Amino acid sequence: MSAMREKGDIIIGIDAGTSVLKAVAFDFSGRQIESAAVRNTYVTGDHGAVTQSLAQTWQDCARALRDLGAKLPGLAQRTAAIAVTGQGDGTWLVGKDNRPVGDAWIWLDARAASTVTRLAAGPMNRARFEATGTGLNTCQQGAQMAHMDTIAPELLDNAEAALHCKDWLYLNLTGVRATDPSEASFTFGNFRTRQYDDVVIEALGLQKRRNLLPEIIDGSQSQHPLSAEAAAATGLLAGTPVSLGYVDMAMTALGAGVCGGTAGAGCSTIGSTGVHMRAKPVADIHLNKEGTGYVIALPIPGIVTQVQTNMGATINIDWILQVAADLMSTPEKPVSLGDLIPRLDDWFNASRPGAILYHPYISEAGERGPFVNANARAGFIGLSSRDRFPELVRSVVEGLGMATRDCYAAMGEMPAELRITGGAARSKALRGTLSAAVNAPVRVSAREEAGAAGAAMMAAVAIGAYPAMDDCIAEWVEPLLGASEAPDAARAHQYEELFVAYREARLALAPVWDKLASGK
């Protein structure tokens, strides 16, 4: 193994997402200098299969780094460290000589549904949840490996290590098989110890497969040098320190502002899905009786982020605007979704608040947070003849606010301040709705690539650019948080009452959704 280099003024953060793999260059103060991206590819198959080529993923990573080097002359010599994060969950198996054992089952793969149902009903599932803080679902490596062990045990028989996406890239960058404390503890371990837990492994029925679980390393404390083979593939210099980041949700939360500044702040990413996070001391974690959500370690001693995710966020807005676009279009003058997005706030402001109740379960996968029901579906309640399209638009936006509140309620109290990221944060209507829904001021993070930044922050601490993560947060995160926007008191009061109806209706509709699903 080559020796570690100790020079340079750039840190590269790699974020291998489900849609795009990005390599982003930052200076030591957290300023984004340049980025390069490669579109990610995965294959959808029968029975809920969604797979991704391990070899292609590494090739895409190497290409992104080479493309970044083409944009930044002298990048190899200037790079002080590299850090990698990526899409969470999923199962990336490697065998002899670190060769892939088939394609990865990524987090979108739903083949383990029957195994999840069986394990969730088992006598040890609550103990598993109490240790991991994480609800069991088809996304997770534990459920997927348990399913493989039932239907295709030869996959596990031929494997020597079960990795996640970022772990696979780290193996290719450094030659080291490892995983990080976040994915290790929410999948197979205990968020209090950040180590594997025998009870969890037994609850999943994977005692005989424990040998596949790799070493746990913390990339903010230890690094490995870039291998000669990886250097040749990426155009970087052998020996450059490489940090294994935490899972992408944790890195995005860190980069976007889940920690720092106002105590008790929450961080919500409003994209196709909604991801809602609270950083808390381990002792303050509230585990709900439904057994949903995630508890994910952060690269700060004793601090974790509690997470609830709702399946459908901006896809609800896309849906209602696409309905309008379809109605407005003619062969001579087509109207697109993009044409209508600028009108969202105007329609919202032309309507009455709280006139209609909307549940934003528009995803065909149903809902996963703060409750799990694959049959959950969207719907309007309270329509009258006086309602027009602006009322529908407003109710959809308000439904996202209610879903956000529902997720934070499952984690305990409302946040003292809400930091929001994602393209939808540009909408004043959405910002005001989220603020009133949780009755807290909102601030928008200007950080463009929060996941890559979070990973790079770990490398910055590891190489000694900052004495501790709190010091890095003060320079990389807090200056990028926008002005505080206070909630409208009248709307906050109205939404307090609306949420009661929202939740009561959500609970009452569950058997209706199930009956609709059984009739299809």
Curated annotation (Swiss-Prot):
Q: Write the gene name.
A: eryA
Q: Does the keyword Amino-acid biosynthesis apply?
A: no
State if Methyltransferase is listed as a keyword.
no
Q: What induces it?
A: Induced by erythritol and repressed by EryD.
Under which name does UniProt file this protein? Erythritol kinase
One Pfam family in the UniProt entry: FGGY_C
GO MF annotation, one: erythritol kinase activity
User: Which EC number(s) does the record attach to this protein?
Assistant: 2.7.1.215
Q: Which residues form a coiled coil?
A: none
Write out the function statement from the record. Catalyzes the phosphorylation of erythritol to D-erythritol-1-phosphate.
What processes in GO biological process is this protein linked to?
A: carbohydrate metabolic process; phosphorylation
Under CDD domains, the record lists: ASKHA_NBD_FGGY_BaEryA-like (cd24121)
Record's keyword terms, sorted: ATP-binding, Kinase, Nucleotide-binding, Transferase
Question: Which InterPro entries does the annotation name?
Answer: ATPase_NBD, Carb_kinase_FGGY, Carb_kinase_FGGY_CS, FGGY_C, FGGY_Carb_Kinase, FGGY_N
Q: Give the record's family classification.
A: Belongs to the FGGY kinase family.
The protein's enzyme class: transferase
**Source taxon at top rank:** Bacteria
Recorded catalytic reaction(s): these are: erythritol + ATP = D-erythritol 1-phosphate + ADP + H(+)
Pathway involvement?
Carbohydrate metabolism; erythritol degradation
